[in-house]
């Protein structure tokens, strides 16, 4: 199981990459295959990845083509091929073969209700520390 971590600064200050890196060090045992982060001003997300699908192209966080949406996902989306084909038919372009990238475009197309279209194994609880 991967390790996902993030920071949102309510004071509006920039997120320090060192803070996300330190959080990643704590979860290194959960994702030995890869690590990545994205920082956008006062918000930062990062992941320690245990690779299952698209071992080379599944680096996370993932973004859409214009980098306006970002995602990290701990799970496996079983119906991602069908969803991807549907989204490509609507004009969405993909950068990787990762099942997680489907989440970005499905969210863009359907909003919060996109989760009802997913068939897979993923964490469905929110945790606040």
Place the predicted regions along the sequence by residue.
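N-terminus-centric sequence/structural signature that marks the extreme N-terminus
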Residues: 1-129
């Amino acid at each position: 199981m991967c390790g996902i971590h993030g920071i949102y600064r309510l004071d509006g200050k920039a997120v320090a990459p060192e803070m996300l890196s330190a959080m990643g060090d704590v979860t290194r045992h959960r994702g030995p295959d890869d690590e990545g982060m994205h920082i956008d001003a006062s918000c930062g997300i990062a992941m320690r990845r245990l690779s299952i699908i698209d071992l080379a192209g599944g680096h996370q966080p993932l973004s859409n083509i214009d980098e306006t949406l970002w995602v990290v996902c701990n799970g496996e989306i079983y119906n991602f091929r069908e969803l991807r084909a549907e989204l490509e038919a609507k004009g969405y372009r993909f950068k990787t073969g990762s099942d997680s990238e489907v989440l970005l475009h499905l969210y863009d197309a359907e909003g919060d209700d996109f989760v009802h279209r997913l068939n897979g194994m993923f964490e469905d609880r929110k945790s606040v520390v």
